[in-house]
Every structure is written in structure tokens, then in C-alpha cells.
């Protein structure tokens, strides 16, 4: 393992990376054995985790030898069996080898991804979800168009193996990978497909394949986009105001020509900015409409010829930020013109300059959220609240707490939007649905429930937004809450709820794609 880190920066190392001997290290299978037992212990009774699950390293060697001989009768990826005890021994060794394969491939991949993205392409990579919103606020106002793309989730298994061969010359180490991918492709649910669909399950092997596939796409795409991003000529007179001039001057580099007395001022920052959230990358572009069309055409051709995958044109959409909205992550994003007044005083004379700046304006997606609430049976498709019948067996406090948690998550997540009027419509739907649920439980009306239980129960719920206005860092929050926004740092916990409507749209596209 130390050899990987010592030779990580050498380009020739990736072509001489021999991983096959690592498959015969007993420590590797001890780690995979423990991980398999930890995962399976939650789904199997403890009495089944007995001495029958003792790992035999000799059996593992024989299994690897059979894989090396391309014996496809060995099923490495075993799907859900109707009999949980049938072929459990085969599944046990198959999962152990699969876990070991993942561990072996993760070691060079982690080093390769670090140096390929950050070293070769010289790109600043921000891996945290909390850097998305500052990035959007900083880059989107200076762009006029965006490309909303979806990462292709379907790919032929042989293409994945060939991409691994680009940086791993050791062919025997790729036989287990090829066997796993083809066995999964020949499974009943994928038998009618000509391509493999990476399942959206939380298994370590398929998460590794997804991360590798995304990193492979981005590493090649970054280098191409960087070559096509040329510097813009900029004169010194382009700075009418001196606000933050020192910070702007850091982003400028001067080129001098031999046969020219003039210097060319160019921006270091490229015209093209890339951000990815989950499976939805967004490319912000500053340029003419022809440049946007060329980038969109390049993305389609790139997927078609590099990954031998036909990508439908609707999977790469172009939008103008001033006219259209884009969805990411859970918001509808647009850029609006915001005029501001900057006053500068020079030599006892007052000059007033009217400057027009762009500002990102995130909009709460009211219609998709109402559709999500209708799917969860909180209202109908028109937004009329209905009772949540599946919660009528709970206690009153549990019902109020569940409705309260949903509202807190929605308000907490979308507090970064200026226009919050739509949120109060969602609040009305949830509060009335909560009242109807309590009335249905007690077999009465909303008026009777409010009279018997008292209004203090409703005061307890749906009022958490007042706590946000009284935070210590927001002085005079009552007056500032309507014109300032706060990106809260716990959005990973709220994010699945906020993006559920986008998953529904992706499923519709997948169904059209399968047909």
C-alpha cells in the first residue's frame, strides 16, 4: 500500500500498476469478511451468524482461480433469493470476493482521482455540499447561460472495463470485475437490456463504480473545457468603480508581446464554471449563444464517442438565466438584475454612479412540492389539504411532531430564498392536513378538535420559523429576515425531502428511456 503513495505522482506508475497479487493477501479478506458480517448482521438473525460463516482462504483461492479461467458458472453477484438459506455459502464467498475486489480497486483509484482532477487539470475541487450555494452566488450572476445535464447512468460493462485498462495494465485483476458486471447484466431484471444500469443501492461496490465513472467523465471533461476557455481582453478602463479593486486585481494577469508596446490585461478566471450536485451537473457559461450551442453539442458528442453511448438530446438542456429557471439542488434558480447605487467622494466632490449588478434569485418550487405532498397523501393534486389516514393510529403528540418536523425541514432548507410567500402556502396545507388528521382520529370536526384539545397544541407546532429570527447572529432579525437569506449548514439531512420531486422526474425519464 505504501508503494501506491510513493509512486502516486509518477505518470508511468498508472500504466505499471499490478494489483492481481493483492487478491491473495489474507489480511484483505479478513477485512472484507468483517465488513460482510457487519452488513449482513442487520438483515439476518444472530443464530445464522455461526461457525458456518468462517472464511476459508483456500476456498477463496480456488474461487479466484475459477474466475481467472473465465468460469461464468460462479455467480459473484447473487440477487435476492426467495429462500434466504439457499446457496448462502456461495453468496458468502461471492460477497467476500466482491468486497475484496472493491478494496483493491479503491486504493489506486483514490490516489488517481486526487492527482487527475486537482493535479493534472489544475482545478479547484470543493467536495463539501456546503460549498454549493456560495459557488452559485459567486459564479452564476456573472454567467448568462447554463447547461443542465444528467450524468448517464447506463453504460455497457465492457466500456467500464476498458476505462480501467487505461490506468491498470494488470489484465488478470480485471477478470473479477468483468465477471461481476456481466453476471449482473445477465440477471433477470437486466436481461432485456443491452446496457448495464448501475443500481441505486447503497452497496460499496456499485458506489465505487459510480464514483469512478463520474470521476472519469469529469477528469476528461475538465481538460477539454479548460482548453476551450480562452482569456478575454480587458482594458484598465473596465473598472469604473474601485470597490473591492484589490480583490479584483488579484484575478488579472498581464501578458506582454515582443513587437507590441501595449500590454494585454486578461482574466484568470475562465468563462465556464462547473458544479455537480448528485447526478445533476450544471455548467455556467459566459458567452454568446453560439458558444452555448457548441458546448451542448460537445457534451453529446463526448458521451457518444468516448463512452459509446447514445445520449438523448433532452438530457442536456440549455437555459438563459435571465429568462428561464434551472433546478438545483431542490431550488429553481434564476438570475435577476438588481440596480444598486454606489457613491464615491473624490476631492470634496460627490459623484453618484448607477451600477447594475446581477444577483442569483433562488425560487421555492411550490408546484413540485405540492405534487410531492399529494404523493404522500397530505393534499390532493390541486393543493387541497386532506387527512393523513395512515397516521391516525398515532398519539396526538406524535402526529403534531411529524407535521412539525416536515414544516421545519422545508422552512429550514428554503430559508435561502428571498420570496417566501409560497412557503406559507405549504404551511397552510400542512397545518390544515394536521387538523384534519386529528379530527379523523377523534371522529369529529376540526372545530371540535380545536375546542377540546385547545389552541395551545397548534401554537406548539408550525411556529419554529420564529426561532430562526431570534438567532444570536441575526440582530434586528425581524426587519432583516425579509431581505436577507441564510444558507443553513444542515442541508444534507433535509436534502432527501427537498429533492424527492426531482427523483420522480428522473424515474419518468428512465421509464421513457427503457421503452
Swiss-Prot record:
Cited InterPro entries: Domain_X, Maturase_MatK, Maturase_MatK_N
Subcellular location: Plastid, Chloroplast
Family membership noted in the UniProt record: Belongs to the intron maturase 2 family. MatK subfamily.
Classification lineage: Eukaryota, Viridiplantae, Streptophyta, Embryophyta, Tracheophyta
Swiss-Prot/TrEMBL GO biological process terms: mRNA processing; RNA splicing; tRNA processing
Name this protein carries in UniProt: Maturase K
Pfam families on file: Intron_maturas2, MatK_N
Molecular function terms from GO: RNA binding
HAMAP family: MatK
Primary subcellular site in the record, as a coarse category: plastid
GO cellular component, one term: chloroplast
Function text: Usually encoded in the trnK tRNA gene intron. Probably assists in splicing its own and other chloroplast group II introns.
Endpoints of the signal sequence: none
TM segment ranges: none
Amino acid at each position: 500500500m505504501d508503494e501506491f503513495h510513493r509512486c502516486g505522482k509518477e505518470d508511468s506508475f498508472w500504466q505499471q500498476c499490478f494489483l492481481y497479487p493483492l487478491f491473495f493477501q489474507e489480511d484483505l479478506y479478513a477485512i472484507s469478511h468483517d465488513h460482510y458480517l457487519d452488513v449482513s448482521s442487520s438483515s439476518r438473525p444472530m443464530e445464522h451468524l455461526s461457525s458456518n460463516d468462517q472464511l476459508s482462504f483456500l476456498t477463496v483461492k480456488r474461487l479466484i482461480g475459477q474466475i481467472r479461467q473465465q468460469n461464468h458458472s460462479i455467480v459473484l453477484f447473487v440477487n435476492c433469493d426467495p429462500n434466504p438459506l439457499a446457496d448462502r455459502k456461495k453468496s458468502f464467498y461471492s460477497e467476500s470476493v466482491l468486497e475484496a475486489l472493491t478494496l483493491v480497486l479503491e486504493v489506486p483509484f483514490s490516489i488517481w482521482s486526487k492527482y487527475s482532477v486537482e493535479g493534472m487539470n489544475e482545478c479547484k475541487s470543493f467536495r463539501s455540499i456546503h460549498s454549493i450555494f456560495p459557488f452559485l452566488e459567486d459564479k452564476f450572476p456573472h454567467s448568462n447561460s447554463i447547461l443542465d445535464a444528467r450524468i448517464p447512468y447506463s453504460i455497457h460493462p465492457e466500456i467500464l472495463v476498458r476505462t480501467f485498462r487505461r490506468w491498470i495494465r494488470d489484465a488478470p485483476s480485471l477478470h473479477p470485475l468483468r465477471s461481476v458486471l456481466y453476471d449482473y447484466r445477465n440477471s433477470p431484471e437486466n436481461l432485456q437490456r443491452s446496457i448495464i444500469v448501475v443500481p441505486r443501492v447503497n452497496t460499496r461496490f456499485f458506489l465505487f463504480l459510480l464514483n469512478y465513472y463520474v470521476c472519469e467523465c469529469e477528469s476528461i471533461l475538465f481538460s477539454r473545457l479548460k482548453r476551450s476557455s480562452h482569456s478575454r481582453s480587458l482594458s484598465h478602463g473596465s473598472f469604473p468603480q474601485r470597490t473591492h479593486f484589490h480583490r479584483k486585481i488579484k484575478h488579472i494577469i498581464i501578458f506582454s508581446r515582443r513587437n507590441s508596446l501595449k500590454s494585454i490585461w486578461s482574466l484568470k478566471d475562465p468563462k465556464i464554471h462547473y458544479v455537480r450536485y448528485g447526478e445533476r451537473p450544471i455548467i455556467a457559461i459566459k458567452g454568446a449563444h453560439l458558444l452555448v450551442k457548441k458546448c451542448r453539442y460537445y457534451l453529446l458528442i463526448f458521451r457518444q464517442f468516448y463512452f459509446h453511448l447514445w445520449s438523448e438530446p433532452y438530457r442536456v438542456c440549455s437555459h438563459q438565466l435571465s429568462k428561464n429557471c434551472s433546478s438545483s439542488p431542490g431550488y429553481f434558480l434564476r438570475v435577476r438584475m438588481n440596480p444598486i447605487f454606489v457613491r464615491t467622494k473624490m476631492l470634496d466632490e460627490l459623484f453618484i454612479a448607477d451600477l447594475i449588478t446581477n444577483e442569483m434569485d433562488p425560487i421555492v418550487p411550490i408546484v413540485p412540492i405540492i405534487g410531492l405532498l399529494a404523493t404522500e397523501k397530505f393534499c390532493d393534486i390541486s393543493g387541497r389539504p386532506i387527512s393523513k389516514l395512515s397516521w391516525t393510529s398515532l398519539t396526538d403528540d406524535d402526529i403534531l411532531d411529524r407535521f412539525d418536523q416536515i414544516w421545519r425541514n422545508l422552512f429550514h432548507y428554503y430559508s435561502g430564498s428571498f420570496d417566501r410567500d409560497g412557503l406559507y402556502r405549504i404551511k397552510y396545507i400542512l397545518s390544515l392536513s394536521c387538523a384534519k388528521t386529528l379530527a379523523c382520529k377523534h371522529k369529529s370536526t376540526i372545530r371540535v378538535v380545536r375546542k377540546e384539545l385547545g389552541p395551545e397544541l397548534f401554537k406548539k407546532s408550525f411556529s419554529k420559523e420564529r426561532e430562526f429570527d431570534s438567532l444570536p447572529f441575526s440582530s434586528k432579525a425581524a426587519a432583516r429576515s425579509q431581505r436577507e437569506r441564510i444558507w443553513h449548514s444542515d442541508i444534507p439531512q433535509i436534502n432527501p425531502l427537498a429533492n424527492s420531486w426531482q427523483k420522480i422526474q428522473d424515474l419518468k425519464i428512465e421509464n421513457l428511456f427503457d421503452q
